[in-house]
């Protein structure tokens, strides 16, 4: 293997000092030591190692006079070479790990009676809570008169027939003209 050397020239100016002196000394020594060898000007090169069979194939394709590239041979290499048997396909498709697993964690919601997963809020009950919360937020927005005007006090929701207690003094009170839902606790 022939010795190779790469000389770098910095595009930015080097500050005067020990770094510049070392750099200039290195360049001078390299130029002196390599000046006795006759070589073409240095340029980046690409070396590719490949099997010898590819060179033989390249010589064979010259006879075809077609415009072909090495990428043409890569695409057919990735194609399947043998057909899978029906037994293998069935085993692959009907793999026990791919079958739908039976859920044993399904329970009945005690509030509404719909099916739900254990330790998860029922979807129907969640929808009721979301709708009630949306109505309360709309009422609060109408009282404030716009965004960014909310007072910095705690908000309390009172339904029909409820009165604020002594500890609720100083809180912002939102009154709803309907009966309190059973799932909406007062605390």
From Swiss-Prot:
Zn(2+) binds at residues 109, 112, 122, 125. The gene is Mrpl32. Belongs to the bacterial ribosomal protein bL32 family. It is found in: Mitochondrion. This is Large ribosomal subunit protein bL32m. GO terms for biological process: mitochondrial translation; translation. It comes from Mus musculus (Mouse). GO terms for cellular component: cytosol; mitochondrial inner membrane; mitochondrial large ribosomal subunit; mitochondrion. It comes from the Eukaryota. MRPL32 precursor is processed by the m-AAA protease (composed of AFG3L2 and SPG7), which cleaves the N-terminal transit peptide. Cleavage by the m-AAA protease takes place prior to assembly into the large subunit, an essential step for mitochondrial ribosome (mitoribosome) assembly. Proper processing by the m-AAA protease is dependent on the zinc-binding region within the tightly folded C-terminal domain of MRPL32: zinc-dependent folding halts degradation initiated from the N-terminus and triggers the release of mature MRPL32. One of its GO terms (molecular function) is metal ion binding. The keyword Transit peptide applies. InterPro entries: Mitoribosomal_protein_bL32, Ribosomal_bL32, Ribosomal_zn-bd. Keywords: Metal-binding, Mitochondrion, Ribonucleoprotein, Ribosomal protein, Transit peptide, Zinc. Component of the mitochondrial ribosome large subunit (39S) which comprises a 16S rRNA and about 50 distinct proteins. Component of the mitochondrial large ribosomal subunit (mt-LSU). The mitochondrial ribosome (mitoribosome) is a large ribonucleoprotein complex responsible for the synthesis of proteins inside mitochondria.
